[in-house]
Protein backbone atom coordinates (compact mmCIF):
# COMPACT_ATOMS: atom_id res chain seq x y z
CA UNK A 1 0.00 0.00 0.00
CA UNK A 2 2.86 2.36 0.84
CA UNK A 3 4.30 1.75 -2.63
CA UNK A 4 1.10 2.99 -4.30
CA UNK A 5 1.01 6.00 -1.99
CA UNK A 6 4.49 7.03 -3.15
CA UNK A 7 3.45 6.57 -6.80
CA UNK A 8 0.40 8.74 -6.19
CA UNK A 9 2.52 11.45 -4.55
CA UNK A 10 5.01 11.28 -7.45
CA UNK A 11 2.18 11.63 -9.96
CA UNK A 12 0.80 14.67 -8.16
CA UNK A 13 4.21 16.32 -8.00
CA UNK A 14 4.78 15.69 -11.69
CA UNK A 15 1.29 16.93 -12.50
CA UNK A 16 1.98 20.16 -10.64
CA UNK A 17 4.95 20.93 -12.84
CA UNK A 18 2.94 20.09 -15.97
CA UNK A 19 0.04 22.28 -14.84
CA UNK A 20 2.27 25.25 -14.20
CA UNK A 21 4.05 24.96 -17.54
CA UNK A 22 1.42 23.51 -19.89
CA UNK A 23 -0.88 26.53 -19.85
CA UNK A 24 1.37 29.53 -20.04
CA UNK A 25 0.05 33.04 -20.47
CA UNK A 26 1.60 33.54 -23.88
CA UNK A 27 -0.31 36.50 -25.36
CA UNK A 28 -0.28 35.18 -28.93
CA UNK A 29 -1.89 31.88 -28.03
CA UNK A 30 -4.38 33.64 -25.74
CA UNK A 31 -5.56 35.83 -28.58
CA UNK A 32 -5.96 32.81 -30.84
CA UNK A 33 -8.32 31.05 -28.43
CA UNK A 34 -10.28 33.89 -26.87
CA UNK A 35 -13.22 33.12 -29.16
CA UNK A 36 -16.17 31.21 -27.79
CA UNK A 37 -16.10 28.75 -30.68
CA UNK A 38 -14.82 25.23 -30.01
CA UNK A 39 -11.70 24.20 -31.88
CA UNK A 40 -12.91 20.57 -32.16
CA UNK A 41 -16.12 18.93 -33.37
CA UNK A 42 -15.69 15.72 -31.40
CA UNK A 43 -13.33 14.67 -28.64
CA UNK A 44 -11.07 11.62 -28.58
CA UNK A 45 -10.02 10.39 -25.15
CA UNK A 46 -6.36 9.76 -24.48
CA UNK A 47 -5.28 6.15 -24.09
CA UNK A 48 -6.33 4.96 -20.63
CA UNK A 49 -5.94 1.21 -20.20
CA UNK A 50 -4.63 0.18 -16.80
CA UNK A 51 -1.20 -1.47 -16.89
CA UNK A 52 -0.72 -0.62 -20.58
CA UNK A 53 2.84 -0.19 -21.82
CA UNK A 54 4.70 2.75 -23.30
CA UNK A 55 4.48 1.12 -26.72
CA UNK A 56 0.68 0.68 -26.37
CA UNK A 57 0.25 4.39 -25.65
CA UNK A 58 2.58 5.41 -28.49
CA UNK A 59 0.70 3.21 -30.97
CA UNK A 60 -2.67 4.63 -29.87
CA UNK A 61 -1.46 8.22 -30.07
CA UNK A 62 -0.03 7.79 -33.57
CA UNK A 63 -3.26 6.18 -34.77
CA UNK A 64 -6.22 7.73 -32.90
CA UNK A 65 -4.77 11.07 -31.82
CA UNK A 66 -2.41 11.91 -34.66
CA UNK A 67 -2.84 15.69 -34.26
CA UNK A 68 -0.63 15.25 -31.17
CA UNK A 69 3.12 14.78 -31.53
CA UNK A 70 5.51 13.23 -29.02
CA UNK A 71 7.37 16.24 -27.62
CA UNK A 72 9.23 14.54 -24.81
CA UNK A 73 10.04 11.19 -23.26
CA UNK A 74 11.70 11.25 -19.86
CA UNK A 75 12.76 8.62 -17.41
CA UNK A 76 13.91 8.75 -13.82
CA UNK A 77 14.44 6.16 -11.10
CA UNK A 78 10.71 5.63 -10.51
CA UNK A 79 8.82 6.57 -13.68
CA UNK A 80 8.73 6.99 -17.43
CA UNK A 81 6.76 9.87 -18.92
CA UNK A 82 5.54 10.60 -22.42
CA UNK A 83 4.50 14.16 -23.24
CA UNK A 84 2.39 14.83 -26.33
CA UNK A 85 1.43 18.28 -27.59
CA UNK A 86 -0.50 19.70 -30.52
CA UNK A 87 1.96 22.54 -30.97
CA UNK A 88 -0.73 25.19 -30.55
CA UNK A 89 -2.86 26.49 -27.72
CA UNK A 90 -1.06 24.62 -24.92
CA UNK A 91 -2.99 21.38 -25.44
CA UNK A 92 -1.22 18.21 -24.41
CA UNK A 93 -1.31 14.78 -22.84
CA UNK A 94 1.10 13.49 -20.19
CA UNK A 95 1.34 9.72 -19.65
CA UNK A 96 3.10 8.30 -16.58
CA UNK A 97 4.35 4.72 -16.33
CA UNK A 98 6.05 2.93 -13.44
CA UNK A 99 9.71 2.27 -14.08
CA UNK A 100 9.59 -1.07 -12.24
CA UNK A 101 6.81 -2.70 -14.30
CA UNK A 102 6.52 -0.28 -17.20
CA UNK A 103 2.76 -0.06 -16.68
CA UNK A 104 0.57 3.00 -17.16
CA UNK A 105 -0.70 4.55 -13.93
CA UNK A 106 -1.70 8.14 -14.71
CA UNK A 107 -2.82 10.33 -17.59
CA UNK A 108 -3.22 14.11 -17.55
CA UNK A 109 -4.91 15.64 -20.57
CA UNK A 110 -4.79 19.45 -20.88
CA UNK A 111 -7.67 20.75 -22.98
CA UNK A 112 -9.02 24.15 -23.99
CA UNK A 113 -11.94 25.58 -22.01
CA UNK A 114 -13.71 26.50 -25.28
CA UNK A 115 -13.99 22.76 -25.98
CA UNK A 116 -15.43 22.05 -22.54
CA UNK A 117 -19.06 21.55 -23.60
CA UNK A 118 -18.09 18.87 -26.13
CA UNK A 119 -15.75 17.13 -23.69
CA UNK A 120 -18.11 17.23 -20.70
CA UNK A 121 -20.98 15.89 -22.82
CA UNK A 122 -18.75 12.98 -23.79
CA UNK A 123 -17.67 12.34 -20.19
CA UNK A 124 -21.27 12.53 -18.91
CA UNK A 125 -22.45 10.11 -21.61
CA UNK A 126 -19.68 7.56 -21.06
CA UNK A 127 -19.01 7.74 -17.30
CA UNK A 128 -20.91 8.18 -14.04
CA UNK A 129 -20.47 11.32 -12.02
CA UNK A 130 -19.35 10.34 -8.51
CA UNK A 131 -22.23 11.12 -6.13
CA UNK A 132 -21.27 13.35 -3.23
CA UNK A 133 -17.94 14.35 -4.79
CA UNK A 134 -16.98 18.01 -4.61
CA UNK A 135 -18.25 19.85 -7.67
CA UNK A 136 -17.56 23.41 -8.79
CA UNK A 137 -18.93 24.43 -12.18
CA UNK A 138 -16.97 27.70 -12.31
CA UNK A 139 -13.70 25.81 -11.89
CA UNK A 140 -14.84 22.97 -14.17
CA UNK A 141 -14.23 20.66 -11.23
CA UNK A 142 -15.98 17.30 -11.58
CA UNK A 143 -15.31 13.68 -10.66
CA UNK A 144 -16.35 10.70 -12.78
CA UNK A 145 -15.83 6.96 -12.58
CA UNK A 146 -16.25 4.05 -14.95
CA UNK A 147 -18.86 1.34 -14.42
CA UNK A 148 -16.65 -1.06 -12.45
CA UNK A 149 -15.17 1.83 -10.43
CA UNK A 150 -11.60 0.89 -11.38
CA UNK A 151 -10.79 4.38 -12.66
CA UNK A 152 -11.43 7.91 -11.42
CA UNK A 153 -11.51 10.86 -13.80
CA UNK A 154 -11.20 14.32 -12.30
CA UNK A 155 -11.35 17.63 -14.10
CA UNK A 156 -10.27 21.09 -12.97
CA UNK A 157 -9.66 24.43 -14.62
CA UNK A 158 -5.98 25.39 -14.45
CA UNK A 159 -6.05 28.76 -16.24
CA UNK A 160 -8.38 31.08 -18.11
CA UNK A 161 -7.97 28.97 -21.24
CA UNK A 162 -7.14 25.43 -20.10
CA UNK A 163 -8.46 22.66 -17.91
CA UNK A 164 -7.02 19.28 -17.01
CA UNK A 165 -8.60 15.86 -17.19
CA UNK A 166 -6.79 13.43 -14.89
CA UNK A 167 -7.25 9.66 -15.21
CA UNK A 168 -6.21 7.62 -12.17
CA UNK A 169 -6.52 3.88 -11.71
CA UNK A 170 -7.85 2.29 -8.52
CA UNK A 171 -6.30 -0.92 -7.18
CA UNK A 172 -8.69 -3.26 -5.43
Model-derived segments and spans:
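C-terminal motif of bacterial Sec signal peptides marking the signal peptidase cleavage site
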Residues: 18-22
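Bacterial N-terminal signal peptides
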Residues: 9-17
Amino acid sequence: MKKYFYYAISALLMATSVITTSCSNDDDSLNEIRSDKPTITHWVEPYHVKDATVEDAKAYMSDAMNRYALSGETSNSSSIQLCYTTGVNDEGVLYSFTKHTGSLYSIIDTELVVNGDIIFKYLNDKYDEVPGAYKNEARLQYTFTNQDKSMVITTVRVSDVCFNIDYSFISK
